[in-house]
């Protein structure tokens, strides 16, 4: 059984971001850090819909 992460957890962890949101490694860690958690959560909602 795999661990399920919240959008906020993914938005705060570059490794998780790369695994779930950016598998093609298009965003650098600097770009990731420059975005707020809220911005990264909004990107996930846009891509995958609201959290259940």
UniProtKB/Swiss-Prot annotation:
Keywords: CRISPR-cas system evasion by virus, Host-virus interaction, Inhibition of host adaptive immune response by virus, Viral immunoevasion
BP term (GO), one: symbiont-mediated suppression of host adaptive immune response
Highest taxon of the lineage: Viruses
Job description of the protein: Allows the phage to evade the CRISPR/Cas system type I-E. Prevents the DNA-binding activity of the CRISPR-Cas complex.
Protein name: Anti-CRISPR protein 31
Annotated source species: Pseudomonas phage D3112
Organism taxonomic ancestry: Viruses, Duplodnaviria, Heunggongvirae, Uroviricota, Caudoviricetes
């Amino acid at each position: 059984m795999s661990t399920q992460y919240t959008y906020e957890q993914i938005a705060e962890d570059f490794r998780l971001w790369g695994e779930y949101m950016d598998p093609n490694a298009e965003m650098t860690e600097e770009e990731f850090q420059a975005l707020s958690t809220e911005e990264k959560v909004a990107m996930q909602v846009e891509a995958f819909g609201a959290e259940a």
